[in-house]
Design a protein with these regions (language model features):
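Repeated loop/turn-to-beta-strand initiation elements of outer-membrane beta-barrel proteins
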Residues: 2-8, 40-44, 77-83, 111-119
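Residues that define the transmembrane beta-barrel architecture of outer-membrane proteins
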Residues: 24-28, 42, 61-67, 97-101, ...
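Residues on the lipid-exposed face of transmembrane beta-strands in outer-membrane beta-barrel proteins
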Residues: 14, 30-34, 48-50, 69-75, ...
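Hydrophobic/aromatic-rich structural module bridging two neighboring secondary-structure elements via a short loop
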Residues: 1-31
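Detector for outer-membrane/organellar transmembrane beta-barrel domains
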Residues: 29, 41-90
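Gram-negative outer-membrane beta-barrel proteins
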Residues: 16-22, 38-40, 54-58, 93-95, ...
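Transmembrane beta-strand segments that form the barrel wall of outer-membrane beta-barrel proteins
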Residues: 7-16, 45-54, 83-93, 121-127
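Predominantly the C-terminal beta-signal and adjacent terminal strand-loop region
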Residues: 97-150
């Protein structure tokens, strides 16, 4: 792209959760990202695109066309540490009251620069507006990960 503040993105996800009304979900999305602002210690990027998802083994076992709206925010605290959050909204194109919301927030610190090894602590909240009868629409996960760059 000619504009350095614009970019194409592609995302894919595989979700498996025994507390949901499906065995697993596959989602694929692509679209345009725009860098809204970038300073030395913080940045904000917005994303808008479209794609599809399918919940295998559940009541809605079919491909659902979706839009995607999201943002990625980052704040560098020091040269080695940062805070970040990612937000994504996935409304069903055919029924806008059917949507999913994903929110991830975390803290990351660089442990070894030569290996590009980082320690990441995060929370990940998933909300489904139509989770299925007897299932909770909100799912909060948390984690600690050791991350290596390539």
């Amino acid at each position: 792209m000619a504009n350095p503040n614009l970019s194409w993105y592609y995302s894919g996800a595989y979700d498996r959760d025994r507390f949901r009304d499906f065995d697993f979900r596959v989602s694929l999305h692509s679209g345009l990202g725009a860098l809204l602002y970038k300073f030395d210690d913080r940045s904000l990027r917005a994303r808008m695109g479209a794609g599809t998802s399918r919940e295998f083994g559940g009541q809605m076992d079919e491909w659902i066309p979706e839009l995607q709206f999201g943002f990625d925010w980052e704040r560098k605290l020091t040269k080695r540490t940062r805070l970040y959050t990612n937000f994504d909204l996935f409304p069903n194109v055919e029924e806008l009251s059917d949507y999913r919301l994903n929110l991830r927030a975390g803290f990351e610190t660089l442990l070894d620069e030569a290996l590009d090894m980082r320690l990441r602590a995060f929370v990940f909240n998933q909300y489904d507006s139509q989770p299925g009868a007897g299932f909770n629409g909100n799912d909060l996960n948390y984690g600690l990960a050791l991350v290596f760059g390539f």
